[in-house]
Amino acid sequence: MAEYIMAVQNGRNIPTEDKIFGSSRRANEMKAERGEDAVINATIGALLNDDGDLMVLSSVDDTFMGLEPEEYASYAPIGGTPAFRKAVVKAAFGTYQPKGFVEAVASPGGTGAIRNVIANYSCPGDKVLTSDWHWSPYGTIASEIGRSIATYEMFTEDRKYNTQALQAKIEELLAVQDYLVVIINTPAHNPTGYALTVEDWEKVVEILRNVAPEKHVALLVDAAYIDFAGDEEEQRAFLPVLETLPANVLPIMAYSASKTYTIYGMRCGADICLAPTKEIAEEFRRVCEFSARGSWSNCAKAAQSIIARIFSDEALLARVTEERAEIRDMLLARGKAFEEEAAKVGLTIVPFDGGFFVSIPCDNPDALSARLEQEGIFLVPLAKGLRVSVASVSEEKCRLIPARIVAAMEAEAQAQKNADEEAAAQA
């Protein structure tokens, strides 16, 4: 029986349901059946308070409520309003003043930003490089426009960032393709919570300095969670390192205003380049705007107006920054609690520094996730393990989950042992 009736597959692997949204749907169904207290839903990639309600910065909400109709109902320019494009650079870079040529192009969240970089800085059929632990929609975005994902092992055996594996994979891919997009999601990497150090970045840049001059690399920094990783200025300490790259390597930041300003549903982000020449920066803006026009036309104006207003009012900006710091501290406390309890019960987690997510390496994550769901604990199964959203559950629940995972692992291992013994007995 054909998998498709009228639609054309076009080489894509299209699941019947998104894993993350599917897990969350099942959690909500169990809540409706058994009650709120019977379920821990650690799948959601948004900040929720301890009662499970969405946390929205009141300062941002007040700004939204104060918009004039012209600020939300009229079309925005394809690349974003001038005020937004100026403000989003400040939002993304903080106090850092780039020395190169900067251009920003609006996108519907960080997802749109990633899409446009892949579309414009790689060729159909090319592989896009990222780490083995990565946000799974990278693969969806790539396949949707005729590319695919290649990965390198993110961590060494001593749990350090694996620059040797990165270098080997870059060399392997550039031996067969002239263009390469390298995606590095940091700080507060999704799904692990890891953040590259400045020393890590210096090694990455050294690797890219050795790329042959006739090759072209777009270094895409997916900084979606940068403002929830820790001190906002410390998390941007790597930015000057990016401006030491050679002319054939273009650093681009995919920035998510949707997350930083807790307006997830407004889908607001930007691609921001740090180009060595004016010509490269202008080309960046032109090609990204062209792709935007052919994909979503232009982005919703309301969020752009909110960001522009915030950065035009120092008192409002201070209020937003202070309020975000409060919920960031809550988030970091949850992550620390999970990390502490994992250590107590002997649960290995992937190196974690901060952010929305923690990951647990394991065999057969789908089976383990299904077992935990039977007990009312909903996590996201990945290729190499399980993802826990500490953003969406209380600190108390963050302390409960590790022991429950260990128990489920032991039960799953025993079930597999029993199955193997039964199979051997029947052989």
Residue ranges and their predicted role:
Residues 68-215, 226-245:
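Conserved core of the PLP fold type I
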Residues 17, 90, 94, 98, ...:
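PLP-dependent enzyme catalytic core of the Aspartate aminotransferase-like
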Residues 49-50, 321-372:
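Conserved PLP-binding catalytic core of the aspartate aminotransferase-like
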Residues 223:
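Walker B catalytic acidic pair
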Residues 101, 351-357, 381-385:
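Short Gly/Ser/Thr- and Asp/Glu-enriched loop/turn motifs at secondary-structure junctions
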Residues 87, 243-324, 328:
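Conserved core segment of the aminotransferase class I/II
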Residues 3, 10-109, 416, 426-427:
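N-terminal small-domain helix-loop-helix segment of the aminotransferase-like
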Residues 220:
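Generic enzyme active-site microenvironment
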